[in-house]
Amino acid sequence: MLTNIAKKIFGSRNDRLLKQYRKSVARINALEEQMQALSDADLQAKTAEFKQRLADGQTLDGILPEAFAVCREASRRTLGMRHFDVQLIGGMVLHDGKIAEMRTGEGKTLVATLAVYLNALAGKGVHVVTVNDYLASRDAGIMEPLYNFLGLTVGVIISDMQPFDRQNAYAADITYGTNNEFGFDYLRDNMVTDQYDKVQRELNFAVVDEVDSILIDEARTPLIISGQADDNIQLYQIMNTVPPHLVRQETEEGEGDYWVDEKAHQVILSEAGHEHAEQILTQMGLLAENDSLYSAANIALMHHLMAALRAHSLFHKDQHYVIQDGEIVIVDEFTGRLMSGRRWSEGLHQAVEAKEGVEIKRENQTLASITFQNYFRLYTKLSGMTGTADTEAFEFQSIYNLETVIIPTNRPVQRKDFNDQIFRSAEEKFEAVVKDIEECHKRGQPVLVGTTSIENSELVSHLLQKAGLPHNVLNAKEHEREALIVAQAGKVGAITVATNMAGRGTDIVLGGNLKHQTDAIRADETLSDEEKQAQIAALEDGWQAEHDKVMEAGGLHIIGTERHESRRIDNQLRGRSGRQGDPGSSRFYLSFEDPLLRLFALDRAAAILNRLAPERGVAIEHNLLTRQIEGAQRKVEGRNFDMRKQVLEYDDVANEQRKVIYSQRNEILTSKDISDLMQEIRSDVVSDLVDTYMPPDSMEEQWDIPTLENRLAAEFRLHEDIQSWLKADNAIDGQDIKERLIERIENEYAAKTELVGKQAMADFERNVMLQVIDNQWREHLAAMDYLRQGIHLRSYAQKNPKQEYKREAFTMFQDLWNGIKFHIASLLTSVQIEQNPVAVVEEQPIGNIQSIHSESPDMEELLGQSQTDLVTEAFNPDGTDFSPEALEARGQIVHRNDPCPCGSGLKYKQCHGKLA
């Protein structure tokens, strides 16, 4: 109560922030006439002026009013769009590193230009993050004329783009791309073996569009670059036959072999189930008599069994995945989009492939990974935009330290949100949905129907076909057409069925999107200019009549066929209607067979239903029920937040380790001279080895000199008779032996360096170090995965799993670091080097970020001969000279990172340029 009184007196935090921003808006508006009076050249010159002022010590905040005024005027001249006052507020919110919640249709894409322009002036690069390649290309294409007018360059990162093009895109002042592309490029940059192969600059400032979708919905899914591991494909096929023989329990305490926890999305095998599974596997010959699934030798069998059970019990066709071109393609549960190239980890994808009888591809081994939570926290400044952030404001603040500011609409919202209608069965619910659609269609009111799965969208489509109602279906299977379908969803009587409207990125304009239609006419090369103008004029006249008719019919009507787990997703669907003060309406139709009600609100809601006891086909509308459902949604949101927070807490451990490894790797990559580091590593390794067999403060009887000599000979090719040293000098101790051994190793190493040359040795050292780090890090990631999967069992021993994970992960990391140093020292001191021995080992090209990536070269390949001769022979059979001198003589200019003119497809520096 006191809080409410304080808010009435002082206003909420949001009100106070808006009040401050409005003062800046007044200053920007005061500059408008001055900017309008400038010529194009004078307006463009402002960018250079701002950059100079920043170089002279002014801050971005200091030039904000002028920069925003310049951007607004440039937008009016180039795009024909002038920023509203509320859009100026949105721009300031983004610049301040906060989240701007703006309703659909309020022009978020235009809002971003203000903060992007201002921050790009600093010359450190700005990233604009979208949810898919289409939106990245579209938004960049729309805004590029504005940025180019202001003297700034624009780049776009899309999947399948080559590294050289990526470097150019990142070098631009402003770079558009998807969250996946930015994240995977960061990981790939930390796998290169040549610093010039890196594509990203420093992570300076990012504006994330649909920030809730990216930072919350996708936060539980880490980005993983993986290579194919050795795996027994046949085992997946065999294990796929086991689940049908096991009995599913109806309840957690019921009889059977396994229990499916739909809330936690897990399968739990009972004691009886373990015994039954062991019997089946023994009969199949996979398990020895009286052997246990829990024995160390059978961990892989248990892993495959649980993957098969999850595939059969939790993952359903046309809901969690579809089969396309003989492959299992994951469906994004939040947006309904196909996630081509993505694969589930831990053998689950292979288990689903076995279940559906498609080709089983090998399991992946993690080479590098990071969560979106930790990736986006690497930016110096982060901000975001969305239509629905307020329900997740606490999570944004606690995880990302991002405050949410609700931006007022330019015009008041006129949409009517009707109470939910709740039915006994799904059949009754869908009958009511079709009836509502039919009534809207008769009066010419466009309808958007939102479903939570492909299965339901196809069911609604089937019912509409039976009713003879023309409609469009927008789901993951129709990905290519979605922008066009959404653009025309506001036409008179249009019926659009959408899997999920989250992240669709295209406004629904009442009367249809005229721009899409006129653009199509302008792009039609079969029409003359006169014909194009005539058709566009006719379209514009017809559009106004359609627009007025839709307005009279009540605007866009939204129908939700199910409540989503998150209120935010429901609000996104509702928010498609009522843009820019347009009329509209929304209603959700629910049944007690819906997953949300069945799992989280069943008991009390069913009691209410029994009291009201309506006839078949009669809906219940009650505030108590609506509150009950919202309570269930809050419960799910809280559970999902806890899960995301838990993922972050565990990943934070790996993240600190990742930072250390990547920092060390970067230092090696960029240092011209790493001889001091190498000397330190050799000294540490020899000291540790001596301490192992001659422990400090120990008696001579406890020393194991023969084993020490054998290890030195085997690991370092160092044949020293330490026992004779001890006999010759009774006063000698462990420290003296360390010094002698280090001196011998350093002398031999100096001789090797002199033989091949200092620079050649430095290149060789650098590549060996990078490859050892990568190989050891890869093994460490696998070990961390295994630790993470089993750590929850520590709770049975009354131990805190998180604390145990941190403790063991720290020990494992110490072992990793010691192992890296040992392998580097061992390889570099024991390898036999001939004169002019080594061609620099280049990084293996990594494929599409969403496909299975090639593994890094192994150590045998690293220490082997250069493959350049093979490339030359294959792509240059006639022996043409492609050396720099020969190319220059022929007038050809080929840079190091350009494709080699021999046609091999490799970079010049990796092919014939290497020979030079």
From Swiss-Prot:
EC number(s) stated in the UniProt entry for this protein: 7.4.2.8
* Record-linked SMART domains: SecA_DEAD (SM00957), SecA_PP_bind (SM00958)
UniProt keyword terms in alphabetical order = ATP-binding, Cell inner membrane, Cell membrane, Cytoplasm, Membrane, Metal-binding, Nucleotide-binding, Protein transport, Translocase, Translocation, Transport, Zinc
List GO terms (cellular component aspect): cell envelope Sec protein transport complex; cytosol; plasma membrane
Q: Which SUPFAM superfamilies match?
A: Helical scaffold and wing domains of SecA, P-loop containing nucleoside triphosphate hydrolases, Pre-protein crosslinking domain of SecA
What does the record give as cofactor?
Zn(2+)
Q: Where does Zn(2+) bind?
A: C900, C902, C911, H912
Q: Does the keyword Cell inner membrane apply?
A: yes
The residues that the entry says bind ATP are Q87, G105, E106, G107, K108, T109, D507
The subcellular location is:
Cell inner membrane; Cytoplasm
Q: What reactions does this protein catalyze? A: ATP + H2O + cellular proteinSide 1 = ADP + phosphate + cellular proteinSide 2
The top EC class is: translocase
Whom does it interact with, and what assembly results?
Answer: Monomer and homodimer. Part of the essential Sec protein translocation apparatus which comprises SecA, SecYEG and auxiliary proteins SecDF-YajC and YidC.
UniProt function note: Part of the Sec protein translocase complex. Interacts with the SecYEG preprotein conducting channel. Has a central role in coupling the hydrolysis of ATP to the transfer of proteins into and across the cell membrane, serving both as a receptor for the preprotein-SecB complex and as an ATP-driven molecular motor driving the stepwise translocation of polypeptide chains across the membrane.
Q: Which PANTHER family match?
A: CHLOROPLAST PROTEIN-TRANSPORTING ATPASE, SECA INNER MEMBRANE COMPONENT OF SEC PROTEIN SECRETION SYSTEM
Q: Would you identify the family this protein belongs to, as annotated?
A: Belongs to the SecA family.
Question: What is the protein's given name?
Answer: Protein translocase subunit SecA
Q: Name the species this protein comes from.
A: Neisseria meningitidis serogroup C / serotype 2a (strain ATCC 700532 / DSM 15464 / FAM18)
